Amino acid sequence: MSDIQTLSFEEAMRELEATVGKLETGEATLEDSIALYERGAALRAHCETRLREAEERVEKITLAANGQPSGTEPAEGL
């Protein structure tokens, strides 16, 4: 398992889906299930953060006088 902070949104979503699948089978031991749940919660939080950052970037797109995108304005913290 890789460090969650280094994962792209798509990588984190794939891992989260796989984690949920493992939990849904019910075949993991209790300890493994707890570890999977904890990692899944961290993956979910990472995905939410990446989505929020993307939303902020989209909101910062600047428009020219004709209404066409003319560039971007960096969002704070990015």
From Swiss-Prot:
It is found in: Cytoplasm. Disulfide bonds: none annotated. It comes from the Bacteria. Bidirectionally degrades single-stranded DNA into large acid-insoluble oligonucleotides, which are then degraded further into small acid-soluble oligonucleotides. Heterooligomer composed of large and small subunits. Its main location: cytoplasm. GO terms for cellular component: cytosol; exodeoxyribonuclease VII complex. Gene3D superfamilies: Exonuclease VII, small subunit. The keyword Cytoplasm applies. This is Exodeoxyribonuclease 7 small subunit. Belongs to the XseB family. It catalyses: Exonucleolytic cleavage in either 5'- to 3'- or 3'- to 5'-direction to yield nucleoside 5'-phosphates. GO terms for biological process: DNA catabolic process. The keyword Nucleotidyltransferase does not apply. Its EC number is 3.1.11.6. The gene is xseB. Keywords: Cytoplasm, Exonuclease, Hydrolase, Nuclease. Pfam families: Exonuc_VII_S. It is an enzyme of class 3 (hydrolase). GO terms for molecular function: exodeoxyribonuclease VII activity.
